[in-house]
Amino acid sequence: MKKNIKYIVAAVAGLWLTGCTDDLDRFPLSSLSPETYFNTEEELETFTNHFYSQFPSAASGYGESEDIVNIFTLPATTIGLTRTVPTKGGGWNWDYLREINLYLKYSHRCNNKIAREHYDGIARFFRAYFYFEKVKRFGDVPWYNKPLESNDPDLKKPRDSRQLVMDSIMSDIDYAINYCDDNPELYRVTKWTAMALKSRICLFEGTFRKYHGIAGHETFLEECATISKRFIDESPYSIYTSGDKPYRDLFASMNAIQQEVILARDYDYTKGVKHEANYNTMAQTYGRPGMNKKIVNSYLMTNGTRFTDQPGYKTMQYYDEMQNRDPRLTQTVVGPGYMRINSDKVESPNFSSSTTGYQIIKWVTDASCDGYMGSSNDYILFRAAEVYLNYAEAKAELGTLTQEDLEISIKKIRDRVGMPNIDMFAANANPDPYLCAPETGYRNVTDPNKGVILEIRRERTIELCLEGHRYYDIIRWKEGKMFEQPFLGMYFPGLTQGSGDNRYDVFDMNDGIAGDKEKVDICIYTGKKPSVKNIRKFYKLGEEFVLTDGDKGNIICHDIEKEPRQWNEERDYFFPIPTTERSLTNGALTQNPGWNDGLDF
């Protein structure tokens, strides 16, 4: 039975408005009085329950795009040229902070010390989480640790330094680690959730500082390594390995699997709490997500060698390129022989539902959930594998990584699917040219242990694909230029049949696996639709998709010649401050570099 988080909507009525000066001085007096509330453990729990709605919905995972997955309409952050300074909103909202600080001001009224310290830990966890999200998005922000009155001069104060805010975040998350209950719960914050959040925060801050030239990166990376190792040693969590397809099943399970999942967002179809993971992937008129070719290429062979070292890898067709690859590839996208959960029918990629042909199946459950808002599998917010990855990356970026460190982190993750571990010395002796190339990899890694850093990034990209991490991974690594590169799909060698303008070819995506070798999967054609029998699906070139070299090549998604993308290195690593907020502070709140908002103070 799931334990549902019940949000106290009535207790926070009136707080759902954006804008610094509105949000921070509001309290729903019609609902409750702070001077008479917060007396019991139950009241502390009830009030803090609402903080959980800060967490992202499932759509932030299965709907992730960036450079890993290409959707029908790219987000403005990827296109770059269309980004503008908003008048209001844009992530500059402070309602949750007001609630958290209000709670912390009055929670002392509860005489149950153990309960109070636990729920104070919950509140400080969420304040750390709130500010971490703000720092990622805006950089320096004003720090508030109290609920403000409407005439408080701090409402118009400038930003505080990044160091002050990060030190305050560390203080909050350390308190949460020390005082939150350590009993594992899928849908509530515990000591272990706080440790996982600290690991995430410290890795972000340490690598952001390192690659953006800000002092102090070593301190945060060391903190990340320390707390991650403590989690590995002390926590009750481990990597889920049961079944034939444990990686797929981890995300398709209706109830989050507690062996690995530290915290999940609870979905329940019977209670009307649903999402659209299946619909997003299977519908022909919705997101049409497809994995980018460069990410497909980054999956290793089953023996641990690089796919991109294979002769002719660039022109391999779908069936051949999918053979003997890291099993996570065909547990993330449709592969040859793919069958839906609870089905024995072999299916091929549906190009009408995928921009690249590499159709996403991560988070996808059985066909009964394919309708709009038909999915209700839990969404994972924190899991053990992320902490293991954080540990390995922090140690690698510090230059203190050992093979033993990889044994207790990356190896455990790869053991799930039978993949060999990273060999640190081999990786450093021969860094992957594909991951070094600016077109397909990371241009800013220059450390002596460059090879193993790249391999850990490969592992992170594959393991955490479609879990909402990729955009800010690119930000912290200072690799925004990735968004300017072409987004490509499957390769097709050409149309060899027919003549003139009416040419076509047929492609068996499953090589007869379906049991009907007389019926191939698709026919691609130009001009008039050919009279070819036993074809499951026809696609007209130029309408259904476009290839890089006319009648052959890779599928092109969002052609950069027609839809140019530009990443501004001096501007785009931070979001702009809304103009209304700057005006309310008479310019004390400065704009982020490179964003011209037309205000002159």
Describe the residue ranges of each PLM region.
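Sec-dependent bacterial lipoprotein signal peptides
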Residues: M1-T18
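Flexible, polar/acidic helix-loop-strand segments at domain edges
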Residues: K314-A384, N592-F601
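Long, intrinsically disordered, low-complexity segments
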Residues: C20-T21, N93-W94, R162, S168, ...
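Short coil/turn linking the two alpha-helices of tandem helical-hairpin repeats
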Residues: V135-P142, P184, F204-G213, E397-T400
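Conserved, well-structured interaction surfaces
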Residues: N39-N49, S53-S57, T73-F138, D154-D167, ...
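Extended amphipathic alpha-helical segments enriched in small hydrophobics
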Residues: R127-A128, S199, D378-M424
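An aromatic- and glycine-enriched ligand-binding surface/loop that stacks and positions planar moieties
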Residues: W16, T21-P75, M166, M170, ...
